[in-house]
Amino acid sequence: MQNITQSWFVQGMIKATTDAWLKGWDERNGGNLTLRLDDADIALYHDNFHPQPRYIPLSQPMPLLANTPFIVTGSGKFFRNVQLDPAANLGVVKVDSDGAGYHILWGLTNEAVPTSELPAHFLSHCERIKATNGKDRVIMHCHATNLIALTYVLENDTAVFTRQLWEGSTECLVVFPDGVGILPWMVPGTDEIGQATAQEMQKHSLVLWPFHGVFGSGPTLDEAFGLIDTAEKSAQVLVKVYSMGGMKQTISREELIALGKRFGVTPLASALAL
């Protein structure tokens, strides 16, 4: 029998959650991570599945995700413990044929359930599937320290925040030319914040929740993690710069335009115009 804990997707989730914990982005049970799979990914592991998979209805139907498997982190689970007991902290779920709910095929032992942010994840997956023609498969939410800090001191405006991050590190415009979407503060774990996040995910692969954290999307676990890591590094630089009295020189608009041309990306126009 093939052991699902040795599969590429379980091992990938272990690495991503462990790395995020070590970064300091996921204290206690903070953060959540979902990866969209294909049936072929789980085909070898049916012997590992629960004999009677639990069914959980969704608060709103997701027909675009019908019959789609995911691996997800659990509600109330600590990222630091995923590596110690993957089956207790992760779960493979599969959305049913009409998108009204899902079965827990593997993991989430002892009656555990997926992350409370699953509505936000699933709604964001739907939008990123449409925005990237199915390329994006990962939604990651974490409490990246310096990005959160900046939401207290910068105007919480997409163009302003994006431009500052682009200026904080040269690679940022290349990595996220589509900029950073920003929500107003909202209660987490609700359909409302999920819908608002998904709306921003139509236009941006990064979405900030002020005073809380960040959502990132990407085609692989490495890409989604790297996207957040890049933005967080720029935020760390900016926190240091602001604490030293602010910028005396920075990357100019003309230089940002040249950077976009060199790497074949189209920068977010509203951020470039500032």
From Swiss-Prot:
Record-annotated active site: 117
Requisite cofactors: Zn(2+)
Protein name: Rhamnulose-1-phosphate aldolase
Major localization class: cytoplasm
Keywords linked to the UniProt accession: Cytoplasm, Lyase, Metal-binding, Rhamnose metabolism, Zinc
Cross-referenced CDD domains: Aldolase_II
Function, as annotated: Catalyzes the reversible cleavage of L-rhamnulose-1-phosphate to dihydroxyacetone phosphate (DHAP) and L-lactaldehyde.
Species for this entry: Shigella flexneri
One example GO MF annotation: metal ion binding
Gene3D superfamilies recorded: Class II aldolase/adducin N-terminal domain
UniProt-annotated location(s): Cytoplasm
